[in-house]
Amino acid sequence: MTGFLSLRYITITVGLLVGIGTALFFNAGTLFAQITPPFYSIEYRPYKGPWMQLKTSHFRIIYPKGLDSVAYKSGRILEQQYPLAQSLTGGNLKNFPLVITNYSDLSNGFVQSWNFKSEINLAPIKGKALNPRGGDWLEAVLSHEILHATHGNIKGHFLLNSFGLLFGPDLTRSLNFYPPAGIHEGIAVYHEGKNSLSVNHGGRGNYGYFKAKYWANLLSDSPWSIGDGLIPTEYHYPLNRHYIAGYFFTEWLQETYGEGVLKESLLRHYNRFPLGLGVALKGVTASWPNAMAPVYRKWALDNYAIAHRARNKTQIDDVDYINPLNKELDQRRPLWISPTKLLYVERKPHQERGIYLYDTETQLRRLITSDFFVEDYLYAVDLKSKEIIYAAYKRGATSFNEVYSYLYRESFLEGASKKALIPGSKRMFAPSVDSHRNSLWALKNYLNIAQIYEYRNNNWLQCSQFKNTRPIAIAIHPSMKNTYAFLMQKRGFQGVWFVNNINSCSEIMSSLGGAADIGFDNASIIDIQWHPIKSTLLMSVDDRDGVRVVEYDLYNGQAFVKLDAEFAAYEASYSEDGKLFSFVDEQNQKNIIAVVDSSRIAANSFEWPTMNAIEIEKSSNSVLLGNDLLNSSTNWKIDSYTDDRSWWSPRVILPQIIDQSSFGSEDFSELEVGLFMQSTDILQERGYRFLGTLYRNNLWYQMSYSTKKFRPGIDFTFYRRPNYFIFSPEEGASVDLISDERGWSLGTPLSYRFPSLTRFSSISITPLLYVEGLRYIDGSGSFLSDYVVQTKYGLSSFLQLRVQQLTRDIQPRSGFITFISSQKTFKASQGSFTLNNNRYTYRLNDKYAIYADQKMYLPVWKKKNISILANAVILKQSKNLLFSTNNIRSTGFYSPVFPNSSYIGRFSTETIVPIWYADQGFFTVPSSLKAVYLKVFTHRMYDLANKTNIGYPTRTSFGAELNILFNISNITLSAGFGWYYDVLEKKSDFFIGSF
């Protein structure tokens, strides 16, 4: 499902590895620094008021002050749904945290296994992603997420559960998240239609818009296999296919093998998790997935035939499609601006989403604007000013979780001025132009619903005071004055309310407060659009098994089905003169806009009776989920949320085994062993990491505490870590020693994120202070000297400027990334040590280092997602080196590159050529193949400290690597093999790995 995420997985990605490498570089004891990635990110939350908590029998609901009614409603929904969810998954919950936030308009809900909790944004999902008959936002999202929560806490054999005592609770619990994501989402979507609203055909399993995408693929030449449908896709449409196929596979399993099949299989998987869910299903059903596949496909085909056999499908000839040759396409919302020209929204895998102008006569199109549009894609056309008005999301400056919608104006004339923000439009969406009142109407997020506003005379006025009704869209007749249609959801019903003769926007509540004027039995109206001339309203109506285009005549009260396509047709509109008719046609892996002569549509229409007033009233008053707990919930108590001390105990404990042979000295080749521990509080505003190890008869440690309970936050670290170095007591002699570095560091991260979500820009600056004592140790671990204290200060800065990475990009296709770090000691220090009865004096000279890394991404062939990275790096240090020169060196050289130089530069290029976007899943073996790509690279190193008559000394290497992205369970991995050539050494070699 596009709109809210339901799971967070810990994934091993290239980005994560880069992050670890960065952490290693900036610890002086590079080889001994933490090698375990942080499992819990520390987050700054924009809400800084008091947090409250409501405790129920099984849940702990944490929310901003003032949202008590939302918390109680959430608690009742969760408690009512808990036994239903438990019966499907078998998992148990106790004191499970749910965090509710209201500082984002981007709808989201998820359950995470690491720091086990659920979190939802109050902003309801926009657009068509959820079945309107499933109730309001809280009912939909909570009844979905509770399935993930119970699934995530399945307990199996005692032996496996006891690992929680050894390795922390989160590592053990994460075993439940190893099955394919489509199983997680499939069973949750299945439950949406099995909760107490199922009698009203709620949930996406009873939603034709959702099911049409599956059926379009099922009847195509390339249907998804079981494995394909259960893995998330990053490269092919629809991007939510694991929700869709996961639901159908779950429904088939439950129908074929009984309601307990997944519950038993999930428990069996937990106890045998390395074998995967396919083997677990075999143990329960006695059938391997390859034997299930033909039976499952036949069931799906029969399911489609039964659902569609009574439908009167529209047969239309001479249909023109926009970009019909594209295999994968997402086109939405055609709106006409003349008899032959229309605007529409489009996205392809190699391009961002934009609003385009299309001429039906010339078949030429032109991009008007691109942005991160609100997902209902509702925009308005102002024909007087020749402008479009649309809603787009922008990021907050302080937190990734802070996202708000705004309204913008932009001319659709060629060469016109750029877009302009409409004042006061924060959190608004779904605009509609009222040419009769010279005003603009829009909706504004309000908790889990929305309110109606009008912008007139440069002022916004609130026009509604809804509590249990959510407006979806506003349609204003372009030629008939005082004729308004409001598409709204009221409980499990979604229909149309008409309003006439408005003098003040506040008058609309007298018409909108009652029952709807139009509705259809066991169906939902999901979008509306007026005829430009006539008194008829076009509507897309979802009737559980498909989406039809229906036209309603305002004067005679009759509704006619104008179009019933093979799978789904929606978002229809007439041209300015009414002669042409456009709609979105659902096809395999694409939504494509069709244009046809309107007379051909009229010839195939047939009447569809609307509901009467009594039926509408009854459908609009379904009981809220959890309403049967109204009385008992009065015993639940609200108090202030305060951190309990449970987060002090580690949430994850992992053994550490570090091979120190990388020191390069046989005398010091030995395993360093120890433990890594980490934890965080529920809100993830603060946390700690601890790494303790034993090496050379000494205890080494690194204890870090981070907090972002205030801005900008602090990072504080105590450490004792070793660093290897070579001491030369006399000419031609050398001794290997270890420097024992003990101290603390303090950093204050200052960051700012720019608002664009289509091209990411941010800046981060972190001042650092180190106070460190240094002494020397011999190979046996004996101390040779006392500590000498040295103080260092540093500055780390990170800039990302207009970085863009689209659906099929392996690396960013454009943008700049700059990383600069510097360190400098305050003053020189002096010490001494004794070795072989000789006393040596050493001086820690005043040292400094500046590391600068500039990356520039450039598109080579946008349509094929081919891009190049140009990377320039310098490392300038004092003569007494502060950092190892290996930090700037790239793999591909046979021997050390300028190891003693104080000023080194490197220029590299990496060209990424995607070869195959596989997106293939394997169900019996818990794995999937994501993509295969070629990387061609060049590296040139410069010794900038030693210029000669012919220039700077250089070293060059080049090569290529074939890389494979794949998943084992839900862990993303990268493997490759390649070849490189060292020009100076005149040697080449093959390698296995990835760099």
Report the location of each language-model feature.
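Outer-membrane beta-barrel translocator/channel fold
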Residues: 570, 588-590, 714-766, 772-785, ...
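C-terminal outer-membrane beta-barrel translocator/porin domains of Gram-negative envelope proteins
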Residues: 718, 723, 729-731, 782-929, ...
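Beta/coil-rich, acidic/histidine-enriched accessory regions frequently appended to metallopeptidases
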Residues: 38, 42-43, 51-53, 265-386, ...
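Outer-membrane beta-barrel initiation region
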Residues: 602-716, 797-813
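Acidic/His/Gly-enriched intrinsically disordered linker/tail segments
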Residues: 43, 115-117, 133-141, 149, ...
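A flexible loop/linker signature enriched in serine peptidases of the S9 family
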Residues: 201, 205, 327, 346-355, ...
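Residues that define the transmembrane beta-barrel architecture of outer-membrane proteins
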Residues: 669-673, 696-701, 738-746, 785-795, ...
